């Protein structure tokens, strides 16, 4: 897998790599249709179309949402870092460190909600521990999900 290759190239060729695991990226140009569309993109499209927001399962699954500009900043911080050699070849979580249920996210956008059957194998909880990336690269996310949603829907 890609993470093992990065670690191997760091060890064998002294190539400075870092491995980032991004948590539920969102932003202004996110997909709004298709299998890779995030829940925020789908909800905003449904709101714009006057449709009810569709929640899969009970809506209590929790997600750690990370703004795309915060993800870009994490990459920049790592690229310009003077971190110790021990930092390279390591895995870092890039997330907000806060998670929201899908129901909570939907409630930020609309009261018009419908539930559909759950998908098999869907993760119940994602939550990034961002201590390692903060301690190594002094990175923290800046964008608050609730503020971003309000801006998108004009509140």
Regions found by a protein language model. Give the residues of each.
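C-terminal substrate-binding subdomain of Rossmann-fold SDR/epimerase-dehydratase oxidoreductases
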Residues: 48-155
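NAD(P)-dependent short-chain dehydrogenase/reductase
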Residues: 4-63, 68-77, 107-110
